């Protein structure tokens, strides 16, 4: 079974791998991709396999598949009768309708959306409730105060933040202090061998505040799976084919060149590239847990192998050099 670890100083024990449910009924939040991604049968098979492997934190959002992801998780929980064996993360902030009140982190929107998420998930509590991103139009004190109210009411056990830079995280922590509020348990940001700098600059803030850091997209949106090649178009239906804009400022061509070197390093070590890339992120002292998004139970099994791969600081540094285009090898 995948081992558990404490999420910062929250007192919440979580597995070191979370099941990312962003492909259930869609590909993340964009409405134009609703209905793509995994079907319900696949989603149920993934949740069955994840729980059996100890990957018992399911990470979703109100906006994934337009609510379908939460709904399928709720149906699965009801059919399996395992609510007390599973931890749930969901999120709020992304648009859920056309109007300005249908998004963001205002007290009204958070209150409305947490109730909608509870209904879809068929549960009376959310273990970890995340702000899906910053909301420049709402005072941070209003957002933190609302999360604090929900914790005190028992509606959510813990809350967290996502997609913040250092200034945003520090502003949130200042608001926590000024309100004497419950602090966030978690920061969830992108972090991988191909996307390291911005999140690693936050690790010291998280450590000082007792916040656990969870990394989403530890395979860089699938680039570190090895399924994409620099000289070939992306496979039909893949994330790169459907959401080429989802890679932000990352130069995909340069990244795929680096992936060739990383794949060679994985082959020399005798492990799959995705497992090596996940192990690199998981062995970072600043990282608590990773979100994984397998598309089949077999992929889940191969990703879980990452928890048994041990990397020294030297080996981790050599993988970074390869990711930056240095041809030196992991075994010297």
Regions found by a protein language model. Give the residues of each.
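Short, acidic/polar
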Residues: 36-50, 104-121, 169-173
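N-terminal binding-site loop/beta-alpha segment at the start of enzyme catalytic domains
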Residues: 1-86
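Active-site mouth loops of central-metabolism enzymes
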Residues: 27-41, 96-111, 132-138
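Acidic (Asp/Glu)-rich catalytic clusters
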Residues: 9, 52, 76-87, 118-122, ...
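Active-site groove signature of glycoside hydrolases
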Residues: 118-139
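Short acidic capping loops at alpha-helix termini that bridge into adjacent secondary structure
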Residues: 15-16, 83-86, 90, 124-128, ...
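Hydrophobic residues in well-ordered beta-strands that form the structural core
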Residues: 59-60, 73, 89-90, 161, ...
């Amino acid at each position: 079974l995948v081992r558990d670890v404490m999420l910062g100083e929250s007192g919440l024990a979580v597995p070191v791998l979370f099941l990312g449910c962003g492909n259930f009924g869609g590909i993340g939040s964009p409405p134009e991709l609703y209905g793509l991604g995994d079907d319900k049968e696949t989603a149920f098979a993934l949740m069955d396999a994840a729980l059996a492997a100890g990957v018992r934190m399911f990470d979703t959002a109100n906006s994934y598949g337009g609510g379908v992801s939460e709904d399928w998780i709720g149906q699965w929980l009801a059919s399996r009768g395992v609510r007390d064996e599973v931890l749930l993360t969901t999120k709020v902030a992304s648009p859920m309708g056309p109007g300005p009140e249908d998004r963001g982190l205002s007290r009204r929107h958070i209150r409305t959306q947490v109730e909608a998420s509870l209904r879809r998930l068929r549960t009376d509590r959310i273990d970890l409730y995340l702000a899906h991103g910053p909301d420049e139009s709402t005072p941070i004190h209003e957002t933190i105060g609302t999360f604090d109210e929900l914790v005190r009411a028992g509606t959510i056990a813990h809350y967290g933040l996502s997609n913040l830079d250092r200034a945003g995280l520090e502003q949130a922590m200042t608001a926590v202090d000024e309100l004497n509020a419950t602090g966030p348990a978690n920061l969830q940001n992108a972090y991988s061998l191909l996307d390291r700098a911005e999140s690693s600059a936050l690790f010291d803030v998280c450590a000082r505040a007792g916040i656990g850091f969870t990394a989403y997209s530890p395979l860089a949106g699938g680039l570190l799976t090895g399924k994409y090649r620099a000289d070939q178009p992306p496979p039909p239906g893949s994330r790169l084919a459907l959401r080429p804009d989802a890679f932000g400022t990352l130069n995909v061509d340069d990244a795929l060149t680096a992936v060739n070197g990383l794949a060679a390093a994985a082959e020399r070590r005798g492990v799959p590239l995705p497992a090596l890339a996940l192990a690199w992120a998981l062995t970072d002292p600043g990282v608590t847990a990773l979100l994984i998004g397998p598309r089949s139970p077999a992929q889940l099994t191969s990703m879980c192998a990452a928890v048994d791969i041990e990397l020294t600081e030297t080996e981790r540094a050599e993988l970074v050099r390869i990711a930056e285009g240095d041809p030196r090898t992991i075994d010297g």
